[in-house]
C-alpha cells in the first residue's frame, strides 16, 4: 500500500502553495493518473512520493508518506545528466538486481519491449537513445529492480506509437501499483 496523508507542498522561494491537504491511498493492483497543467507541481509531487529529499532544497513539505514494504520505482521526465553519459551496459550493470537475473529472465524482459537481451550489453550512450528507447530502458531497469510501485512522470512525452503501445501494455498488465502523471 502507498498512502499519502495531508500533504502540503509550498515553494520556499515565493511561498506559492503547490498542493494543500492532499490525500491518496493506492493498494496492490490500483492504477491512478494525476492530470494537470504544465508547471503546476506534478513532477514535484512525483519526486516527493519517490523520495522527499529530492525536493528538499526548494520545497517545504508537510505530511505523511507511508510506503510499507513497497519498492518504489521512478521514471522521470528526463534522463539525468549522469545517466546520459553512461553506456547502456553501465546503466543496467550498476543495478545489483541485474546480476541476480538469469539470461532467460533478461531475455523475457527485453522481449516485452520488442528487443533482444543484447541491448543490455550495448556500449551506446544512454543520452544518444531516442525518447522511446530511453523510456523502454528505464522501464526495463525498474522491472529488473522488482519494484512494486511504478511512478511514471509523463512517460508518454516524446515517444513513438510502438513505445506508447508497449507502455500501455506494461501498465495494464502490471499487478502492483501504478501512479501516472500527465499534462492537460
Residue map of PLM features:
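ABC ATP-binding cassette signature C-motif
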Residues: 1-184
